[in-house]
Amino acid sequence: MCGGLEAREADKVWKIYFPNPKAAIPVLLEESGQLDWIPWGRRKEEPGNGPQGGWARLSTVQSGGWEKYRPRRGFGMVQRYMEKEGRPGEKNRTSHWFDVPEGYALECLVIGEGEQQRVYIVTTAPPAEYEWIHDRWPLLTVVGTEAGCS
């Protein structure tokens, strides 16, 4: 379900981890073409109107479960993402980093406006060879193309 990301800005490499309340992702907004760093999801202790967590299941998006938040499509412009084996709370979970291919981005939903904006990474079933790591996987999309959740 990607608990960590790696993004580059000029010569700087940023490692971003969801548990950090200051976690933000560089997101290219589809409608405006503007690239902004947007806070990643909402943690349990954070106020706000968006759902808790930092992910949106593709099946829920497609069935209309996110419509009440009036999401906008975004592309998470990251170079790598990290998946951890096992379940949250388990000790000594191994991290696995995966490259995002050139020209691809993470499919994202952006909700809210201004300071209340949040980004959620769209997830789907993992590739068969990685099912043993996690049951949810970030959805990769070619930047600027139609996908299953627009």
Task: List where the protein language model places each region.
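Short linear sequence motif anchored by a di-proline
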Residues: 1-150
